[in-house]
Amino acid sequence: MKTKFCIEEENIYKPQLPDVMEAIFDAAYLIFDLIAAILFFIFSQGKILFILYGILTLTLCGGDAFHLVPRIIRTIRGTNDKIKRQLGIGLQVSSITMTIFYILLMYIWKFTFPELKIPVIIGAVIWISAAFRIVICMFPQNNWCTDEGNMKLSVIRNAVFA
């Protein structure tokens, strides 16, 4: 008695060259950023400006790693629901760390140009806007982990950067 086996072709993911190049760029960027942060700390000699540059660089690298590492994994293995969720959470974390990045940049500007004073109201507006943006980023209605997102909240949370 012959038995007929039905073998379905597996849908094997094969990365395309542009995707591989993007993954290489993303990995190189994260490595460069991490090395730059370490160098800022090593050579800071206790100078607050260079310590702030190191913190700024680590903030950028850390936030970007949350969405770039899943992108690199997606390039290598293909996509699935877990990767989509990691990318969504990564974009949310990156959005929050970018806000912190701009706050740190304000302090770097203050230390770089001590003769230029920021009016207290401007500093307050920047801090309030940053807090507002972070709160907006935390709303589940942003749909970070879905394909559709939320255009209205995207505009609101990014308007503070305008």
Language-model region placement:
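Short, Lys/Arg-rich, polar N-terminal cytosolic tail immediately upstream
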Residues: 1-16
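Membrane-interface segments at the starts/ends of alpha-helical transmembrane spans
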Residues: 13-18, 150-154
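Early transmembrane hairpin module of multi-pass membrane proteins
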Residues: 19-37, 43-118
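Membrane-proximal helix-loop-helix units in multi-pass membrane proteins
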Residues: 94-162
